[in-house]
């Protein structure tokens, strides 16, 4: 539960386009200032942003994507997360299409050990087709990607529990994979981002943390969907932490302290337990002012 005057926890997200020196410095300062969580987005190229959704817009195959330096999320995250001592860390979110579930699970278990149990595994079905095409990564239809995500979540659960994991499906197979080390706290928290009915069912079954992007009204509606999905399987929805991910488009939520405080209050009223801001380095003055409210 938040202990600050704002009534919600506050997290910050840095992207893979940050340089190694800059992300080290920022994460160190943000932890010292008292923010509750620090996250890394998982992309390998940028496509610009729309003015409507804040998500990368499709880039025509005939137009090369922008030449923006991007570091790999998990490598960068391992470097900075292991240097923290208090703050929760995580991915927001890793698409199922980038890595085999067994390798992703091993990466997550490694970060869990490196942070002393302060890692949340954020997962999603992926949505940037041009990014996949650019790097030769398969991008199946949405329904298949959600099925792959469900299998990934089941594999993660298997690797956390028994001594060996075996699994066989249309997409993945494991054959007596050794399940060591175990998570520091017995379980790595899983964040799921998504809004469609099947994704909500996966959240209800597997998630410890649900993250969504959108307006306060939209977020409130998705939380109601989550509660309905939980009710269908007999799960208490209060077991799932609820957060909103706020990015720079269409309106920069960190353009001023007043703007940031208004945004935080709006999403607190919508039912959020945590507000997670996407940040740039030039946001630091507002971030420092926000930090004073966390004391």
Predicted regions located by residue number:
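Active-site-adjacent structural elements that line small-molecule/cofactor binding pockets in enzymes
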Residues: 1-295
């Amino acid at each position: 539960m938040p202990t600050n005057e704002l009534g919600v926890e506050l997290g910050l997200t840095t992207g893979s386009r940050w340089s190694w020196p800059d992300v080290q410095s920022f994460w160190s300062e943000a932890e010292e200032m008292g923010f509750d969580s620090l996250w890394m987005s998982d992309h390998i190229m940028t496509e610009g942003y729309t003015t409507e959704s804040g998500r990368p817009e499709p880039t025509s195959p005939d137009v090369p994507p922008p030449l923006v330096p991007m570091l790999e999320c998990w490598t960068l995250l391992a470097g900075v997360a292991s240097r923290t001592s208090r703050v929760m860390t995580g991915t927001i979110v890793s698409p199922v299409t980038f890595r085999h579930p067994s390798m992703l699970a091993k990466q997550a278990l490694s970060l869990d050990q490196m942070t002393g149990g302060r890692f949340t595994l954020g997962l999603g079905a992926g949505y940037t087709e041009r990014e996949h095409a650019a790097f030769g990564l398969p991008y199946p239809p949405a329904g298949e990607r959600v099925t792959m995500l469900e299998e990934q979540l089941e594999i993660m659960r298997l690797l956390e529990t028994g001594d060996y994991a075996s699994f066989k499906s249309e997409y993945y197979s494991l054959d007596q994979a050794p399940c060591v080390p175990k998570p520091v706290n017995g379980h790595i928290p899983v964040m799921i981002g998504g809004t469609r009915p099947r994704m909500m069912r996966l959240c209800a079954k597997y998630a410890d943390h649900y993250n969504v992007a959108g307006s306060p009204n939209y977020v409130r509606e998705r939380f109601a969907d989550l509660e309905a999905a939980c009710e269908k399987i007999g799960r208490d929805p209060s077991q799932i932490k609820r957060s909103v991910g706020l990015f720079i488009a269409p309106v920069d939520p960190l353009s001023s302290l007043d703007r940031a405080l208004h945004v935080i209050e709006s999403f607190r009223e919508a039912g959020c337990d945590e507000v997670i801001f996407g940040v740039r380095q030039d946001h630091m003055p507002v971030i420092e002012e926000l930090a004073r409210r966390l004391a």
